[in-house]
Every structure is written in structure tokens, then in C-alpha cells.
């Protein structure tokens, strides 16, 4: 005998405020944004998922010295985000 299930209740996600500051990018994201077009030009018939995989492989192959500029950009972006977030929260309160 099968018992009827109760319908699942949908949880509604809170709408994101369009005025909220953009989140900080990671060092990998700065690297990926800079190198995505290069990977695509080297492999024109590659799929979207494979581009990400190639970028991940390239990122892992970098030495800490080669990653340094991207990590510096990420630190600067994190500071930008934190200051913008502070300003944003002050306007809400």
C-alpha cells in the first residue's frame, strides 16, 4: 500500500539587492579571466567544461612566484569588497 506524499514546499530565496557590492574575486578567478581567451584560441573546438579543466590544470602547474601577481590582485579586490560592504551596510542601518 502506497501512502500519498505531501507536496514539497518550495523555499523562496531572498532577492539579491542590485546595489550590494560585487563579491571579491579569488586569485584563480583573476588568472582564469586573463587566460580564458588564450586557452580558447589554442583549442578552438574545446567545450565550456574543458576550458575550465584546462585552466585548472594550468593554475595547478604555476609556481607560487607565478601565482603571486594574481594573489596580490585578489588581496586588493578583497579590500575593495570589504570597504564597499562596510559603506553599503552603513547605508542600510
UniProtKB/Swiss-Prot annotation:
Residues 1-23, 69-93 are annotated as: Disordered. Residues 7-16 have a biased composition (Basic residues). GO terms for molecular function: DNA binding, bending; MutSalpha complex binding; nucleic acid binding; nucleosome binding. Disulfide bonds: none annotated. Changing residue 21 to A: Shows a 4-fold reduced affinity for DNA. It is found in: Nucleus; Chromosome. Residues 69-87 have a biased composition (Basic and acidic residues). InterPro entries: HMG_box_dom, HMG_box_dom_sf, HMGB. GO terms for cellular component: chromosome; nucleus; protein-DNA complex. Residues 21-89 bind DNA. GO terms for biological process: chromatin organization; chromatin remodeling; DNA repair; maintenance of transcriptional fidelity during transcription elongation by RNA polymerase III; protein-DNA complex assembly; RNA polymerase II preinitiation complex assembly; RNA polymerase III preinitiation complex assembly. Keywords: Chromosome, DNA damage, DNA repair, DNA-binding, Nucleus, Transcription, Transcription regulation. DNA-binding protein that induces severe bending of DNA. Required for DNA-binding by the FACT complex, a general chromatin factor that acts to reorganize nucleosomes. The FACT complex is involved in multiple processes that require DNA as a template such as mRNA elongation, DNA replication and DNA repair. Also augments the fidelity of transcription by RNA polymerase III independently of any role in the FACT complex. Required for transcriptional initiation fidelity of some but not all tRNA genes. Seems to be functionally redundant with NHP6B. Belongs to the NHP6 family. Weakly associates with the stable SPT16-POB3 heterodimer to form the FACT (yFACT or SNP) complex, which is associated with nucleosomes. Multiple molecules of NHP6 (NHP6A and/or NHP6B) are required to recruit the SPT16-POB3 heterodimer to DNA. Present with 3870 molecules/cell in log phase SD medium. This is Non-histone chromosomal protein 6A. The gene is NHP6A.
Amino acid at each position: 500500500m502506497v501512502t500519498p506524499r505531501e507536496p514539497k514546499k518550495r523555499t523562496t530565496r531572498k532577492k539579491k539587492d542590485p546595489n550590494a557590492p560585487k563579491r571579491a574575486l579569488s586569485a584563480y578567478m583573476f588568472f582564469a579571466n586573463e587566460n580564458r581567451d588564450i586557452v580558447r584560441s589554442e583549442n578552438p573546438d574545446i567545450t565550456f567544461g574543458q576550458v575550465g579543466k584546462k585552466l585548472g590544470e594550468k593554475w595547478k602547474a604555476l609556481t607560487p612566484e607565478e601565482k603571486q601577481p594574481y594573489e596580490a590582485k585578489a588581496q586588493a579586490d578583497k579590500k575593495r569588497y570589504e570597504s564597499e560592504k562596510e559603506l553599503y551596510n552603513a547605508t542600510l542601518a
